[in-house]
């Protein structure tokens, strides 16, 4: 069984760098890591609290997780963001650990999901995060003054 802790900084970062460089060895190794992650083998690691005497920060890692899953499994953008929440969370947290992040955060394409729920037509490119379709804007110069506050009590 793979131990995610053995990929602590900088080893995880080196693996990601080698994968991005396109080495077959790194692709095979990262596939093994993500096979274990998706199976839930790292869930206990994800529950480890970060040290309280340090300042923690991270960036949005969901796009890197998408790139990895697309490369090793062929997962499309729409599949990644809309079908399997366990895979989504585990892939994101694994990328965080590989980058050396001690305090894990969940990130997602909030800007896109917020629009889609309101009726915006979205584009889900194969390897990239979603975005609104610029040819079919939900809000335009003809309707921008007609906007009303959504009824949040209606569910």
Which role does the model predict for each range below?
Residues 1-155:
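Catalytic cores of TIM-barrel enzymes
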């Amino acid at each position: 069984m793979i131990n995610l802790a053995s990929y602590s900084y900088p080893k995880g970062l080196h693996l990601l760098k080698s994968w991005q460089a396109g080495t077959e060895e790194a692709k095979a190794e990262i596939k093994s890591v993500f096979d274990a992650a998706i199976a839930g083998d790292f869930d206990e690691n994800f529950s480890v609290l970060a040290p309280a005497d340090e300042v923690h920060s991270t960036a949005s890692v969901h796009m890197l997780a998408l790139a990895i899953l697309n490369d090793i499994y062929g997962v499309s953008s729409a599949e990644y963001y809309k079908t399997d929440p366990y895979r989504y969370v585990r892939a994101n947290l694994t990328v965080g650990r590989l980058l050396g992040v001690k305090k894990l955060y969940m990130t997602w394409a909030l800007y896109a999901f917020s629009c889609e729920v309101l009726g915006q037509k979205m584009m889900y490119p194969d390897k990239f995060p979603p975005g609104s379709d610029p040819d079919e804007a939900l809000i335009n110069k003809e309707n921008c003054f007609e906007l009303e506050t959504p009824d949040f009590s209606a569910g």
